[in-house]
């Protein structure tokens, strides 16, 4: 028996490859499915099943592509309603895989079709459970994350989830392993642990959903308190996962269209496309195409694109190192952004060589900022998450989380003297680029973010505030 967790940090997502005696299964695969096919080829195994724990909101699953390429059977749990051929399993239905079995455990609450899969070894002993977005390490899945079930309240879903966790998962043996669908950083939970596998026994001690510390009513209140709004692209991803999507190879082929620097702006204007710059924040700050948006490929790239661009159909033109074009298109496609219509030929170097117009981000060191921070006209915007802000922040700073920047709900004024920072510089440059594209030209970025600010003489709050965000 072989179990391999394939964890993608950018999405904080775990897919699973399971193999026994020449037969294999994949649970919650990503859209770029070659990695699973290669694993099966290594041992001359056949992928027999693709198990889906639910209709995912935060990424596009590779279930359809994998099934088409391997003739594997797609399997969902009860209540799933896909628009394509799939086996809708019954609760407690058993699937044979070589010498092992996987048993369907319907565990609704995160969504109504949410399902876990219990693996038993060749001796019939419970070995592990794949919990999808039902049970995370240290947490559970947020109910109704894609706002899909308008007829069921978040409180009702939370109550259903409580029963699923306590009646279906908690009675299982302490020594079995828990393999969740996500880890820390995912928008599908609140307070997940950084670890990606644990024993159920340890979770029964540490996880508030399992340790008996909360009544059902209190569990519902805690889970539904301060629920963040789901990113606006989540419902689109659910729809794609339920109804179907283009094969990734088609998306890549469509996106790999080299566009000369002389035609790049006109193409963006004609197609109403966003010019997305994927280089480092340092390089972007030094020079970039006017009105382009920075979201660096080496940060939390795909989720930030989804949360900030919102519309999965939005045409996108890429500015990225030539050798990373296919990687960029693939990572965008993982979150449903399939409409890449081209990239800047030869990268940003060609723009510089053509001596075309550039824009820059104004910056200031934390040390230099310390000399003006107390001036009355200075406006300080901290674009970190509320939990980060309430832990520690510059005195008199205003918290505007990055995801709230595009709509300018806080009515940032164009004539204010704005100084902006995040934790290390990645998010604040994103925010700066978005506002700059909207006509804000008076924003100065504090280099190094809060980590540099803490090392300076700038006054910050002297408390650490626990948070449930």
Feature-to-residue mapping (PLM):
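Conserved beta-strand hairpin/beta-sheet module of binuclear metal-dependent hydrolase folds
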Residues: 1-46, 117-132, 138
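Core dinuclear metal-dependent hydrolase active-site scaffold
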Residues: 2-6, 16-19, 95-124, 128-129, ...
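Divalent metal-coordination and catalytic microenvironments
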Residues: 18, 28, 54, 66, ...
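Active-site neighborhood of phospho(di)ester-bond hydrolases with catalytic His/Asp-centered motifs
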Residues: 26-27, 47-56, 74-79, 106-109, ...
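Active-site metal-binding loops of divalent metal-dependent hydrolases
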Residues: 29-30, 55, 79, 111, ...
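Active-site metal-binding motif and surrounding structural segment of the metallo-beta-lactamase
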Residues: 33-75
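Metallo-beta-lactamase
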Residues: 111-230
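Rhodanese-like catalytic fold shared by cysteine-dependent sulfurtransferases
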Residues: 142-144, 155, 202-239, 243, ...
